[in-house]
């Protein structure tokens, strides 16, 4: 698995594929540095306006994705 620079995605609309091979689209609202993500110490991003493309489910609340849960992430 290659490293994705999650920090560069802040403010972008993105498509993410997670480790369960589920695809999402949303806006990257926030980046959390590994040092600030206690107790996991894993970098993460928080997405808003999230849509799970596999079944069309829309999420009302922001959702956090840890770097270890993301297979691919790119701006769309």
Predicted regions and their residues:
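Conserved RNA-binding domains used in RNP assembly and mRNA/RNA metabolism
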Residues: 2-76
């Amino acid at each position: 698995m290659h490293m994705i620079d999650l920090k560069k995605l802040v403010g972008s609309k993105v498509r993410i594929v997670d480790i369960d091979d589920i695809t999402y689209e949303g806006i990257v609202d926030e980046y959390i540095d590994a040092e600030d993500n206690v107790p996991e110490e894993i970098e993460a991003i928080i997405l808003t306006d999230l849509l799970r493309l596999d079944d069309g489910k829309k999420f009302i609340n922001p959702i956090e994705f840890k770097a270890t849960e993301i297979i691919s992430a790119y701006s769309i």
